[in-house]
Design a protein with these regions (language model features):
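Aromatic-Pro/Gly-enriched surface loop or interdomain linker
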Residues: 29-98, 104-105, 202-203, 209-236
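Bacterial N-terminal signal peptides that target proteins for export
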Residues: 2-17
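Loop/turn elements at helix/coil->beta-strand transitions in domains of secreted/extracellular proteins
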Residues: 47, 94-98, 123-126, 190-194
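Alpha-helical scaffolding within the catalytic cores
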Residues: 34-36, 82-88, 110-116, 179-183
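Bacterial N-terminal signal peptides
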Residues: 14-26
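Short alpha-beta junction capping motif
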Residues: 98-139
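An acidic, glycine-rich "communication" segment
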Residues: 45-48, 63-64, 136-209, 216-227
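Active-site-proximal beta-strand/loop segments in catalytic clefts of secreted hydrolases
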Residues: 52-55, 101-104, 130-133, 158-160, ...
Length: 236
């Protein structure tokens, strides 16, 4: 296997962009608002977002990639506006330092997928996760898999004071479509946040073309949250 765990390709292509972003963050206490970058003509210059395929053919079909276009407009990060499908059990997953994971109904990961997920998150990867339609069966399966993959860690509530709620878009509170207050959960490994999870959903199904999902109790303004999560994952 090629040593792609450290995401050397990502670092090489984005070092200048990341340096600019860090300087912007250190110079401003307010959320980052910068002018859009110039058009990019090479995919090698773009940040990529993986769309995990797992447990056979489960994938994030109903997770909208619309937030990636918002991200490019609201920050100076150069981003591919489309998800890149990638199998969790494939070596190629390590080419994507940020990925989304979603689905419906119950599922079980293979042993290879569990090993890959653990390696991915412990060696530099970041995962944004939510079930389609707030699916309770999927939520239960996901939590079981996290316990198997990371027996020494647990999902914890992310406080609203966390930078993830202010890094680009100010998000003072989270509510579902019924205006009920909700929260995000996160997985930390050695002090590093490597996963953000919403059981209500951040899929932004209104912008997920070709998806028949009802959205369930999806969090309001999911694209703004996703922009923040992606930016945080890149900068921290």
């Amino acid at each position: 296997m090629k040593n792609r765990i450290e995401f050397q390709k990502f670092s090489r292509h984005c070092a200048v962009v990341l340096t600019m972003c860090v300087l912007l963050l250190s110079a401003h206490s307010q959320p980052v608002t910068v002018a859009p970058s110039a058009p990019v003509h090479s995919d090698l210059a773009l940040l990529q977002c993986g769309n995990l395929i797992y447990a056979g053919n489960q994938s994030s079909v109903c997770f909208a990639d619309h937030f990636l276009a918002d991200l490019a407009q609201q920050t100076n990060l150069r981003v591919n506006p489309k998800f890149c499908p990638v199998r969790l059990d494939a070596d190629a997953v390590f080419d994507y330092p940020f990925s989304v994971m979603s689905g419906n109904e119950d599922f079980s990961l293979t042993q290879k997928e569990r090993q890959q997920l653990r390696k991915y998150l412990t060696q530099g990867g970041f995962l944004l996760v939510s079930p389609g339609c707030s699916d309770e069966k999927w939520d239960k399966s996901f939590r079981q898999e996290i316990k198997v993959c990371f027996p020494e860690y647990t999902l914890q509530k992310i406080p609203m004071t966390h930078p993830i709620f202010s890094i680009v878009n100010p998000i003072p509170r989270l509510v579902d479509k019924n205006s009920k207050p909700v929260s995000l959960e996160g997985l930390e490994i050695n002090g590093r946040l490597v996963m953000v999870y919403s059981k209500e959903g951040l899929n932004d199904v209104a912008n997920a073309h070709g998806c028949c999902c009802c959205g369930g109790n999806e969090i309001e303004g999911p694209a703004k949250v996703n922009v923040n999560v992606f930016t945080y994952a890149v900068l921290y």
